[in-house]
UniProtKB/Swiss-Prot annotation:
Cofactor details (free text): Binds 1 FMN per subunit. Binds 1 heme b (iron(II)-protoporphyrin IX) group per subunit.
Parts of the chain that traverse the membrane: 8-28, 60-80, 86-106, 121-141, 155-175
Family statement: Belongs to the MsrQ family.
Organism listed in the record: Xanthomonas oryzae pv. oryzae (strain KACC10331 / KXO85)
Subcellular location: Cell inner membrane
Pfam family of the protein (one): Ferric_reduct
Entries under InterPro entries matching the protein: Fe3_Rdtase_TM_dom, MsrQ-like
Name of the protein in question: Protein-methionine-sulfoxide reductase heme-binding subunit MsrQ
Single GO MF descriptor: FMN binding
């Protein structure tokens, strides 16, 4: 087993700290609102909590998708070591986002979630994205990679429809100003477009190499 360098350990520690900073700040502001009724979370604290946690889930999802293109562009294979961590943070924030909706918005009437899923399309796609994230989080360990073998890669290709569903969830949720969801949709389009281009280029290269040599005219 390869040893993890000190620089990677330090970098991972910094990434953990940065990834936990948004939820730590949100927790502190929620505590202020709970204790003193301050306006630390604005006029609608529940909406603010749901918005922030959902936004960070989407951001971490896109950052996770950006790891492979960044590795290919920079040649820094060490970036792959951060992909699992970032993907798990996407699932973490998505789960907090869902929990906030269930406990603060529905106020514990969780059976209403099924009615909401059927009635509101943005909740339908958002809940579907969270459900698809779950098997990715569960199978993210080395043990599951060994068990699933080639199927592991197939399972984790779910991240592509998850990205589409997450952006669509945000887009449909916004009622008027779509600039922010459009920005994230553009980033997702670039990340998926890069993968499609690389795959097409690889196929063309393979086809050229396997093509029989043409006879030289006399």
């Amino acid at each position: 087993m390869a040893k993890t360098s000190t620089s990677v350990i330090v970098a991972k520690t910094l990434v953990h700290a940065a990834a936990l900073a948004p939820i730590a700040l949100l927790g502190w502001q929620f505590w202020q609102v709970w204790q003193s009724g301050s306006d630390a979370l604005g006029a609608d604290p529940v909406a603010e909590i749901e918005h922030r946690t959902g936004l960070w889930a989407l951001r971490f999802l896109l950052i996770t998708l950006a790891i492979t293109p960044l590795r290919q562009l920079t040649g820094q294979a060490v970036l792959i070591r951060f992909r699992r961590m970032l993907g798990l943070y996407a699932f973490f924030y998505a789960t907090v986002h869902l929990a906030a909706y269930l406990t603060l918005d529905l106020r514990g009437f969780w059976t209403q979630i099924f009615e909401e899923i059927l009635k509101r399309p943005y909740i339908t796609v958002g809940f579907a994205a969270w459900l698809l994230l779950m098997p990715l989080a569960i199978t993210s360990t080395q043990g599951w990679m060994r068990r699933l073998k080639r199927n592991w890669g197939r399972v984790h290709m779910l991240i592509y429809p998850i990205g589409l569903l997450a952006v669509l969830h945000f887009w449909w949720l916004v009622k008027s100003d779509i600039r922010e969801p459009a920005l994230y949709a553009g980033i997702l389009a670039v990340l998926l477009g890069w993968r499609a281009w690389k795959k097409l280029s690889a196929r063309r290269t393979k086809a050229r190499r396997s093509a029989p040599p043409q006879a030289t005219p006399r």
